[in-house]
A protein has these predicted regions:
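N-terminal low-complexity segments that are often proline-rich with Ser/Thr-Pro
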Residues: 320-322
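Active-site and adjacent substrate-binding regions of carbohydrate-active enzymes
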Residues: 1-310, 314, 318
Length: 322
């Protein structure tokens, strides 16, 4: 038993400190693997936090507990023990660093599962694209940068449409218990109701749980009844029906990414190839090579103004020359 020191003004301590010292988790996960997934050669992916670098082979190595594990490096960036109201908004440079940190850490141990969002996170385009720059072009850029990373790309419902965070007008429109708790924490810390709601709106997982935007009809075509969460007001502009036959839509771009990954001509490079970061010090730019039997260069410019970078040429994909 441990009696942990309080880490907040309410006299309580985050459970994460206890989790970091938990023992015997590997024994349980190994038994679960052997008695369930392994017997059927089933694919499994774990939500893993606080793992040590030397433990990664245990989780996703040749005989790992799971087939893969999600990359949460960018989702926990800027977190604060004080609460959401004190969390930092991630920048393009920080996002780039998080992605490359994971890529270097995992290496060829196994395949990490790359995400922009999921059911427990806000919408990725609202989180990782700078405020005021969220548009179809930037949504495609973010999707491409994430999808082309080494690993297994996961697409959460609505991500392929570029669905965005909802604008909550009142805390009464929020359902998630953690969001309601964080609203109280912000108020107790001295935030105004408006400031507390803004913090909750930015990070609430209810953003990813609003009704799927199928059409521009009633309740976004999700239901003829009353949905339990507010429908995002932008459903008339962002919905599946309007993007189905639009070759320039966000959805069409994701289809192209999927087709590229499945293309036998590029599979060896896109799926199994190495990842080599490039121009890491260039502000508002994320770029990397994928190297296999071919060499592909993936570049995303976060700013409206063009940038100039020195391009490498190489007679061999694995031996770049200036």
């Amino acid at each position: 038993m441990h009696d942990y020191e309080p880490d907040r003004e309410d006299g309580l301590c985050s459970i994460r400190k206890m989790l970091k010292e938990a023992k015997g988790i590997g024994d349980f996960l190994g038994e679960m693997r052997d008695r369930t997934f392994k017997k059927y050669d089933a694919f499994s992916v774990g939500e893993v936090f606080d793992e040590k670098d030397e433990e990664i082979p245990d989780f996703i190595g040749d005989n790992g507990y799971f087939s893969s594990m999600f990359d949460f490096e960018e989702t926990i960036w800027g977190a604060s023990d004080k609460g959401w109201y004190d969390c930092k908004q991630i920048t393009p440079d920080a996002y780039k660093k998080c992605c490359f940190t994971t890529q270097r850490k995992i290496g060829d141990i196994g395949f990490v599962s790359n995400i922009i969002e999921n059911h427990d996170e806000p919408r990725g385009v609202s989180r990782y694209i700078p405020e005021g720059d969220c548009c179809d072009a930037s949504k495609k850029m973010l999707g491409g940068l994430n999808f082309m990373l080494r690993g297994l790309p996961f697409i959460y419902q609505g991500q392929e449409l570029g669905m965005e965070n909802v604008k909550f007008e009142s805390i009464d429109q929020v359902d998630d218990i953690s969001s309601l708790d964080e609203y109280k924490v912000a108020l107790e810390a001295g935030c105004t109701p408006e400031e507390a709601l803004k913090a909750v709106s930015r990070f609430s997982r209810d953003n990813a749980r609003t009704p799927m935007q199928w059409t521009d009809g009633e309740n976004a075509g999700f239901t003829t009844g009353k949905p339990w969460l507010k429908v995002n007001a932008n459903y008339t502009k962002i919905n599946a029906e309007s993007q189905m036959n639009d070759p320039e839509s966000v959805r069409s771009f994701y289809k192209k990414l999927i087709a590229l990954r499945k293309n036998p001509e590029y599979k060896e490079t896109v799926v199994y190839g190495e990842l080599e970061p490039v121009w890491e010090d260039v502000h508002n730019l994320m770029a990397y090579y994928r190297k296999g039997d071919k060499t592909l260069l993936v570049v995303g410019n976060y700013q409206k103004e063009p940038q100039t970078c020195l391009l490498y040429t190489s007679p061999s994909p694995r031996d770049p020359k200036t």
